[in-house]
């Protein structure tokens, strides 16, 4: 195993956190970070777009306190994993199913580290899209938690055909690397005042995210490329056409969600035979980084779900 940088001072997580470089089957270098000591099992934590291992340091403390070790990942194209374009600010992936190669590398790493089983999945936002695909492909977890999963993206109905057409056209005329309309190269938390943000109502957690990127700007990522947008739209459509997997899953959704499409989540969970949807009154997109009361509820109900399905 090759050690990778791990920024413990900004993660603010449990003692002993560490990171390693992983090589995917297509030769890319991604990063995985872990916090060990929980003996009930291990959480495979799939972050959202723009995110990185250290963002979940405080969440790891909560999970470790409740008995679970945590393994998180910098997906290809973000964090300090290999970026996919010369323009490091643009979020990009060649093909959305490529993220499953990262999943395979993370799973092999969990086994190489000897992390305690059973495994459970947490998928936040884009990680919820990747995680749902991984469940269909046989990810060996006993249960899952989805946090505001990206099973749809909020796009005004009048603009939805334009999003499909512009993203499809851009990639076919060699312009797929350009940022999607309405996005910018500066990462969201660095360009948006707290009072205008759509991530959390908790100022302390917003400042925590901002401080991480101020200290380590190499972790930052701007808006998605048009190519990424087209790939994401196609993947979400493919997933929506499939029945829910058998893996038991609890899903958390804030009542103020303004990034992913709530109707897609309601539709999925209404027809999920081993699923439960928990609505969080007043919460925005980042339910694990919300107010203390909301965070505590999420961590308690998540680990109770894992306990019941181990």
Describe the predicted segments one by one.
Residues 245, 251-253:
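Short beta-strand/loop motif that positions the catalytic acidic residue
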Residues 53, 60-86:
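Conserved alpha/beta-hydrolase
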Residues 91-111:
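Alpha/beta-hydrolase active-site loop
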Residues 276, 281-310:
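Catalytic active-site module of serine/aspartate enzymes centered on a nucleophile-bearing elbow/loop
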Residues 1-23, 28-35:
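An N-terminal hydrophobic leader/cap segment in hydrolases
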Residues 126, 131-216:
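Alpha/beta-hydrolase-fold enzymes
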Residues 247, 261-270:
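Short alpha-helix in the alpha/beta-hydrolase fold that links the catalytic acid
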Residues 256-260:
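Acidic catalytic loop of the alpha/beta-hydrolase fold
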